[in-house]
Amino acid sequence: MKYRKPIVVSPYDAELYGHWWYEGPIFLEWVFRATAESNFSTITPYQYLETYPTNQIVDVSMSSWGANGYYDVWIDGSNDYVYRHLHKAAQKMIEVANGREPYNELEYRALNQMARELMMAQTSCWEFIMFTGTMVGYAHKKISDHIHRLFKLYEDFKNGMLDESWVAEIESRDNIFPEIEYRMYRTSWL
């Protein structure tokens, strides 16, 4: 392998910033300001892999910042049922991402909305809420809504039956990540 500049990977749970650690966004701002004035720079994992495509592969042990260093909070009798649905939804997303290109703008929007629905269903907040027993009904409903919308978008896309008004309605209801790109779920994205 050729010489590589040293790299520090510093991942954080996004929930930490502004939710549990209110000063977190300010901390990040100062990190990036200090970076701009220093002799080191930031890089995304994708940019790193483009620069250094040959890498040693490692298996990382499963761990968590949660109780006991494992996933006790997120995989528990109160919430473990969701994972079979999340896995099936992810499989559907990968299938359409690896499939044919959208024929038109509506299909493209629908696939991007599928990606949004999957990300919103996969947020660990829902399982955390179920475990802690706060707003449990709300958490069940949110996961169910996002999964059902994703499956409906999938079926409508596969059958050529997309309803523009329904797609527009769910886009306006949940339009987080307006620049999302469904192709990121392709197995050949990198």
Predicted features and spans:
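Active-site and substrate-binding clefts of carbohydrate-active enzymes
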Residues: 1-190
